[in-house]
């Protein structure tokens, strides 16, 4: 049986020509509605056709990351996701509250899909925003990728054709000047470069293609 609706809760405009239903729960799906219009005498009341409400559930998104979640230079972690109950159409990865777009520092591959690979430049808090086949959007849980403190100096690729990177641990947000000095096999200094470091394992690029082959 039909019952009259009143303003309040999800309903507004109950006695106007337009009934608005705001953020109804999924349990409202398949509810049927009709409108009765009453005119001045001698006009009789008129009842509309029945309209059926469809409420699609929000997607439930769960993300996880493979070990290790505390990264050293050269290591990666892979994020995967599950979306239910309906298939996803679009994927937007979020790091520290900012939606990532190509190219994104620290993301090796996968933006725009349900799985991404991140390296040591991609530290932060990750979420995934999904829109499903019904146009419903939701955001996942949060997974954090951290640095792993080490006293080692990382140099790669090695061997190299002349261009390589050097990484050494620094405390996050501690902006430091750093001097990099390279010596040849005889112990002679052949190159000195200066860098400003602000993140753990900030990348220091070196180009020695102008130097001869050998051990340094």
Residue ranges with predicted function:
Residues 1, 83-92:
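Solvent-exposed loop segments of extracellular immunoglobulin-like
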Residues 10-30, 106-123:
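Solvent-exposed segments in extracellular or luminal domains encompassing
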Residues 37, 130-132:
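Conserved structural position at the C-terminal beta-strand
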Residues 41-47, 133-139:
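Short, exposed coil/turn segments at beta-strand boundaries within extracellular/luminal domains
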Residues 51-57, 143-149:
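Interdomain boundary/hinge segments at the C-termini of tandem beta-sandwich modules
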Residues 57-66, 149-155:
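Proline-enriched interdomain boundary motifs that mark the N-terminal boundary
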Residues 74-83, 163-167:
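A short beta-strand segment in extracellular, disulfide-stabilized domains
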Residues 90-99, 149-156, 161-216:
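C-terminal outer-membrane/trafficking sorting elements
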């Amino acid at each position: 049986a039909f019952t009259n609706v009143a303003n309040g809760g999800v309903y507004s405009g109950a006695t106007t020509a337009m009934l608005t239903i705001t953020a109804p729960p999924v349990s409202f799906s398949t509810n049927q509605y009709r409108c009765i219009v009453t005119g001045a005498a001698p006009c009789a009341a008129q009842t509309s056709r029945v309209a059926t409400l469809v409420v699609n559930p929000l997607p439930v998104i769960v993300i996880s990351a493979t070990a290790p979640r505390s990264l050293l230079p050269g290591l990666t972690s892979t994020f995967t996701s599950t979306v239910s109950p309906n298939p996803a159409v679009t994927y937007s990865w979020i790091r520290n509250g900012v939606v990532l777009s190509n190219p994104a520092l620290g993301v090796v591959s996968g933006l725009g899909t349900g799985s991404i690979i991140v390296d040591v430049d991609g530290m932060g808090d990750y979420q995934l925003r999904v829109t499903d086949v019904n146009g419903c959007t939701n955001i996942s849980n949060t997974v954090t990728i951290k640095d792993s403190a080490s006293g080692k100096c990382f140099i790669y690729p090695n061997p190299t054709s002349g261009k390589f990177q050097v990484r050494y641990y620094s405390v996050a947000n501690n902006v430091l000047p750093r001097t990099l000095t390279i010596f040849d096999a005889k112990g002679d200094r052949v190159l000195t470069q200066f860098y400003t470091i602000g993140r753990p394992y900030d990348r220091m690029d070196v180009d020695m293609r102008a130097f001869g082959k050998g051990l340094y």
